[in-house]
Swiss-Prot record:
Subunit annotation: Monomer.
Coiled-coil regions listed in the entry: 845-909
Protein name per the record: Valine--tRNA ligase
Highest taxon of source: Bacteria
Enzyme class: ligase
One example of a Gene Ontology biological process annotation: valyl-tRNA aminoacylation
Record keywords, A-Z: Aminoacyl-tRNA synthetase, ATP-binding, Coiled coil, Cytoplasm, Ligase, Nucleotide-binding, Protein biosynthesis
Catalytic reaction equation(s): tRNA(Val) + L-valine + ATP = L-valyl-tRNA(Val) + AMP + diphosphate
PROSITE patterns, per database record: AA_TRNA_LIGASE_I
Binding site for ATP: K542
Domain remarks in the Swiss-Prot or TrEMBL record: ValRS has two distinct active sites: one for aminoacylation and one for editing. The misactivated threonine is translocated from the active site to the editing site. The C-terminal coiled-coil domain is crucial for aminoacylation activity.
Recorded family membership: Belongs to the class-I aminoacyl-tRNA synthetase family. ValS type 1 subfamily.
InterPro entries registered for this protein in UniProt: aa-tRNA-synth_I_CS, aa-tRNA-synth_Ia, Anticodon_Ia_Val, M/V/L/I-tRNA-synth_anticd-bd, Rossmann-like_a/b/a_fold, tRNA-bd_arm, tRNAsynth_Ia_anticodon-bd, Val-tRNA_synth_C_sf
Length: 910
């Protein structure tokens, strides 16, 4: 094993090496018999059709950080991977392929179509999984699941049959979201409401008795052919006398009643609404309440059926135009107004969906939701992070309606119900009896027992909503309904990490299904992350065409850089993040900054390892307290504070804060200061036994601190830290990923010392800045006078004299309580109450320095006067926003301070 690092970090090579090594060695394979508290996460299964987008990268980075931390903490950890069969998405792809070949799925038939679907899955379905591998996710690939694999299919059948036998699944005729493009019912999640510019058409509906008319307004004129009533609000006095009368429906000449219903908004349109119970959710409710007929107008493809009369066979939008023209020709059109309103679109078919009366399978939700609510109210289970999402989840559970679970597709879990078609002359109707069973043999046996030996069966052609199998995901993936070792050890799972957009559709369904079948909520915590927004603050999405390909950034900057950026950008749990990206150059400043951080760590580690004389941290050990110098005790105290802080922040899901804290400690405290402070000891210029001992202690502290840093950072940047740890420890056959996470050594924590050392660092920083401002050559030795009336401050400065001399290139250091009188030809600065002076005689050309400072002073004075003039202008002060005025005052104060400092510098130069 090599004991040195290459001069440059090459992320592509390193990442591929460790991803392969981890997977081939089964480093992340879970064992339920292993000791340790269980920590389990099931992956939110991406669609098998998917490819990696920034949302996946963000979510996976968050999960992997948590999982790697808990594994290193000593927990018995399982991150279970898998993919979702994505019924509509796969079917859409396959039907698009068939269309290009001039075929339809009906031309192939169900069996051949499914063969083709499985073939497509085998050839193309692993894209998203392989891309997740590029992220370095520490999942147990031996447990990878697919929502249509044999075990999960058995779980789906079991769940369906149990719910049916308990009376919680039924077949009924209700309104569903119907997508004419896929010719299937779709879930609410698959519907996206879009604001569109449309029209509001006003039509006359004449009273049958000839005594007048009502004017109704609608955004969908074609549905008037299915009207079976007109409704008004019972408190609307304008129409009180008309309730109970009838109107004659134009074009159809159907007599329909006028009813009073609280659902009617008197302010919408004229306060009269047409009622089409088969094609509108509110109208459906009113139709049931007033016993109105339900007339279905639509075919599955969105064209009008025979109930459309003269418009039968026309597409719904073509029929809309023609119905309006016919009503206008007959004098029933009153007016047309522009109207912006919300239209539901199917997210796959990209066409408006229709509320359609259809016979479907439903799950009764009320009792399932009540159980989930009881867990939330009594035990705060699950615990939402951030807490506010618990209220959103609760509100949704209260408002739940029965869940339509059938889809008119072929790819998916076919509903385990067989119709006894011999009882209805070979046809499937609303009255055909059916048998629910695990397979056809069981169904046939049941049917023969009930209907005789000559029965004929036909399985329901529909498949289950994808969310039905996804709702079983946390426990079906572990072997349910069998009582497996995995289920006993890892269920309920520990944390679910997901976006807020599917709390309603996935999280709630999992809690309801799991609570019903296992008696336990499926996860202890639900960490809701925010959205990934683009450089303009807009949500990244396909429709907005503003997404960034994570693989492009991975190839350019490395996986660790992208992961670290995504996590570091999180201001707090649940907050959105914004990713800076130059689309013309394909560059990201924020990801580049993380790559620079990786390079900084690499270079620091390389320097440390080159100065350890080939020894590992174990071989070196850590010096006892009495041998530690001031800087050693400071960095070890800071290290242990950071260990405690990082552990607490990760435990509380403050991953962004943890990432930022590590960045500041590693780059600032360790790289910029401690390594620099340790260099003179490493180079052992003083020699002798004392010098050699000081060198050894510096090596020990450097090795210990670097080792701890690598471990602390591993969950966030796993690849570079694995490479560094392997080299530092000269390890063979071991992985950093399986080592213990650092724990706090309270005996090394010294807050008072940290405060002292912070003063030293600020003093050194000021000396460096003054040298640079004065133009003193880097190697030139200087005199520094440090003045403070505070005894404790002077004592601290004297304790740090060695560091001030070494880092500040100080030949003559004076720590005094009072400055000598008439200090001239010097440059000065201030640290708290400490005055810092560097005499300049013989070091720089004072005339050049005076001219430089005078130019800066002139510029600052001009800026000061400009701001002052603006603030004295009543027109600006009276009209400008408060924040603009406050900003101007702040700039004025800053300019005043800088001007005074420059004036004092000129005065001191003489």
């Amino acid at each position: 094993m090599t004991t040195s690092l290459p001069p440059q970090y090459e992320p592509t090579v390193t990442e591929a090496k460790w991803q392969t090594a981890w997977e081939e060695s089964h480093a992340f394979k879970a064992d339920p018999d292993r000791p340790g508290e269980p920590y389990c996460v099931v992956i939110p299964p991406p669609n098998v059709t998917g490819s990696l987008h920034m949302g996946h990268a963000f979510e996976s980075s968050l999960i992997d950080t948590l999982v790697r931390y808990h594994r290193m903490r000593g927990d018995n950890t399982l991150w279970l991977p898998g993919t979702d069969h994505a019924s509509i998405a796969v079917q859409t792809i396959l039907e698009r392929q068939l269309k290009a070949e001039g075929k339809t799925r009906d031309d192939l038939g169900r069996e051949k179509f499914l063969e083709r679907a499985w073939q497509w899955k085998a050839e193309s379905g692993s894209t998203i999984v392989n891309q997740l591998r590029r992220l370095g996710v520490s999942v147990d690939w031996t447990r990878e699941r697919f929502t249509m694999d044999e075990g999960l299919s058995q779980a789906v059948k079991t769940a369906f049959i149990k719910l049916y036998e308990e009376g919680l699944i039924y077949r009924g005729n209700y309104l569903v979201n119907w997508c004419p493009a896929s010719q299937s019912a779709v879930s609410d999640l698959e519907v996206e409401n879009q604001e569109v510019d449309g029209h509001l058409w006003y039509f006359r509906y004449p009273l049958t008795d000839g005594s007048g008319e009502l004017v109704v307004a609608t955004t969908r004129p074609e549905t008037m052919l299915g009207d079976t009533g007109v409704a008004v609000n019972p408190h609307d006095e304008r129409y009180a006398a008309m309730v109970g009368k009838t109107i004659t429906l134009p074009l159809v000449n159907r007599e329909i009643p006028i009813v009073a219903d609280e659902l009617v908004d008197p302010e919408f349109g004229t306060g009269c609404v047409k009622v089409t119970p088969a094609h509108d959710p509110n109208d459906f409710v009113m139709g049931q309440r007033h016993n109105l007929p339900f007339i279905n107008l639509l075919n599955k493809d969105g064209s009008l059926n025979e109930n459309g009369g003269d418009f039968a066979g026309q597409d719904r939008f073509e029929a809309r135009k023609n119905v309006v023209q016919a009503l206008e020709a007959q004098g029933f059109l009153v007016k047309i107004e522009p109207y912006r309103h919300s239209v539901p679109y199917g997210d796959r078919g990209k066409v408006p969906v229709e509320p359609l009366l259809s016979t479907q399978w439903f799950v009764k939700i009320e009792s399932l939701a009540q159980n989930a609510l009881a867990c939330l109210d009594e035990d705060n289970s699950p615990n939402f992070v951030p807490e506010r999402w618990g209220k959103v989840y609760r509100d949704w559970l209260v408002k739940l309606k029965d869940w339509c679970i059938s889809r008119q597709l072929w790819w998916g879990h076919q509903i385990p119900a067989w119709y006894v078609i011999s009882e209805t002359n070979g046809a499937i109707t609303d009255h055909t009896p059916f048998i629910v069973a695990y397979d056809e043999a069981e169904a046939l046996a049941k049917a023969k027992a009930e209907y005789g030996p000559t029965v004929q069966l036909q399985q329901d052609p529909d498949v289950l909503d994808t969310w039905f199998s996804s709702g079983l995901w946390p426990f079906s993936t572990m072997g349910w309904p069998e009582q497996t070792d995995d289920l006993a050890k890892y269920y309920p799972t520990s944390t679910l990490v997901t976006g807020f957009d599917i709390i309603f559709f996935w999280v709630a369904r999992m809690t309801m299904m799991a609570g019903h079948f296992t008696g336990q909520i499926p996860f202890k915590d639900v960490y809701i992350h925010g959205l990934v927004r683009d450089e303009n603050g807009k949500k990244m999405s396909k429709s907005a065409n503003n997404g960034i390909d994570p693989l492009l950034l991975i190839n350019k900057y490395g996986t660790d850089a992208l992961r670290y950026t995504l996590i570091r950008e999180v201001a707090g749990a649940g907050q959105d993040i914004s990713l800076q990206y130059d689309r013309q150059k394909d560059e990201s400043e924020s990801v580049e900054a993380s790559r620079n951080f990786a390079n900084k760590l690499w270079n620091a580690a390389r320097f440390v390892m080159m100065n350890l004389d080939g020894q590992t941290p174990q071989q070196l050990g850590l010096a006892p307290g009495e041998d530690l110098e001031l800087a050693d005790r400071w960095i070890l105290s800071r290290l242990n504070q950071v260990i405690q802080q990082t552990r607490e922040q990760i435990e509380d899901y403050g991953l962004g804060e943890a990432a930022k804290g590590l960045y500041e400690f590693i780059w600032g405290d360790f790289c910029d200061w401690y390594i620099e402070l340790a260099k003179p000891r490493l180079w052992n210029k003083e020699g002798g036994d004392v010098g050699t001992q000081r060198q050894l202690v510096a090596r020990q502290v450097l090795a210990h601190t670097l080792d701890s840093i690598i471990k602390l950072l591993h969950p966030f940047m796993p690849h570079i830290t694995e490479e560094l740890w392997q080299t530092l420890h000269q390890a063979e056959g071991q992985f950093l990923a399986l080592q213990a996470y650092p724990t706090v050594n309270q005996s090394l924590v010294d807050p008072a010392l940290e405060t002292q050392f912070a003063l030293l660092i600020e003093t050194l920083r000021t000396i460096r800045n003054l040298r640079a401002e004065a133009g003193i050559k880097p190697g030139a030795m200087v005199t520094v006078i440090l003045q403070s009336e505070n005894d404790q401050e002077r004592q601290t400065l004297q304790l740090g004299e060695t560091y001030i001399r070494d880092i500040g290139k100080v030949e003559n250091l004076q720590v005094v309580s009072q400055l000598p009188p008439e200090q001239t030809q010097a440059i000065a600065g201030v640290v708290d109450t400490i005055q810092v002076l560097i005499p300049l005689s013989g070091l720089v050309d004072l005339d050049i320095l005076r001219n430089k400072i005078q130019k800066t002073l002139d510029k600052v004075t001009k800026e000061y006067e400009s701001i002052e003039k603006r603030l004295s202008n009543p027109g600006f002060v009276n009209k400008a926003p408060e924040e603009v005025i406050a900003g101007a005052k702040e700039s004025l104060n800053a300019a005043a301070v800088q001007r005074q400092m420059l004036q004092e510098r000129l005065k001191m130069l003489g």
